[in-house]
Every structure is written in structure tokens, then in C-alpha cells.
């Protein structure tokens, strides 16, 4: 079972960071798991329910890509940008450069989807799963993926 929060329900004060471990994906990097702790549960990561306006999903090589109109999703993009900024600021890595990968992807009007088989629906809902932070000698950012809700 996954507990999904709306952006309005999300609370930065419920975020905790685990100790850094060796990153298995980025060479010479670290991974810091994020925990979301509410009064009656703790989640490994953050799960946010997002509803985009005017989407078009297409096959992109062996994956899927969702295109959307930036102007019609401006408020949602701004909210996600603020969440990303606040999470990276909360971890307080001085001397390193934050990488805003979620916002960079959104401002281009598309997201890459992680799914093997996508069913056609009229549903414009997605889950943004933020599992942690990655860190290198110079940069740091969030580890995330977008999942289509069927």
C-alpha cells in the first residue's frame, strides 16, 4: 500500500533524512534516503498526487513520455518547484551546487514515465515519488520518478 499526499497536504516539517550511504548508481556519490513521518505512519520517500491539464502520452523508445502545456499547468509546476527548493534547502549542503532536475524537466513541458505497460485512460493523474537525495563532490539533487495512475 502506498500513502499518497496531495500537494496541499504535504508538510516539509514531516521530512527526515537518513544517514548517507554509498550511491549504487552514481560513481563516487552518496545517497540519502528521505522519510516522511506523519502522526500515524512513516513512509520511505514522498508520494505526491499530481493532476496535469491537457496531456499527451507517447511512446519514447522503450519508455513513455507525457507532454503537457506549460501555461495550463503553471500553478502545479510552481508548487513542485517550491517543494524541490525547500527539500534541497532543508538538507543544508554548504559548498555544493543544487541541481533542480524535477523543475528542469517540468519547465520543458514533459515528464518521463516509469511503467512497462501503459493503459489508455482519460485520467491525468500521476504520482511523483521522491525517494531521496543524491550527492557528488560538486552537486546534489533529488532522486525521483513519475508514475502514471491508471
Residue ranges and their predicted role:
Residues 1-95:
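OB-fold ssDNA-binding interfaces and closely related basic DNA-contact patches used
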Residues 105, 118-122, 135-140:
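Intrinsically disordered, low-complexity regulatory regions enriched in Ser/Pro/Gly/Thr
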Residues 130-150:
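OB-fold single-stranded nucleic acid-binding module
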Amino acid at each position: 500500500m502506498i500513502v499518497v499526499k496531495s500537494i496541499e497536504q504535504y508538510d516539509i516539517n514531516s521530512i527526515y533524512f537518513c544517514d548517507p550511504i554509498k550511491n549504487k548508481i552514481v560513481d563516487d556519490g552518496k545517497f540519502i534516503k528521505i522519510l516522511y513521518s506523519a502522526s500515524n505512519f512513516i513512509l520511505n520517500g514522498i508520494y505526491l498526487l499530481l493532476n496535469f491539464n491537457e496531456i499527451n502520452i507517447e511512446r519514447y523508445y522503450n519508455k513513455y513520455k507525457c507532454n503537457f502545456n506549460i501555461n495550463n499547468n503553471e500553478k502545479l509546476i510552481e508548487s513542485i518547484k517550491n517543494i524541490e527548493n525547500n527539500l534541497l534547502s532543508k538538507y543544508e549542503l554548504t559548498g555544493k551546487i543544487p541541481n533542480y532536475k524535477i523543475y528542469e524537466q517540468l519547465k520543458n513541458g514533459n515528464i518521463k514515465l516509469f511503467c512497462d505497460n501503459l493503459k489508455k485512460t482519460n485520467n491525468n493523474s500521476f504520482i511523483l515519488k521522491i525517494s531521496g537525495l543524491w550527492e557528488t563532490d560538486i552537486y546534489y539533487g533529488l532522486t525521483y520518478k513519475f508514475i502514471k495512475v491508471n
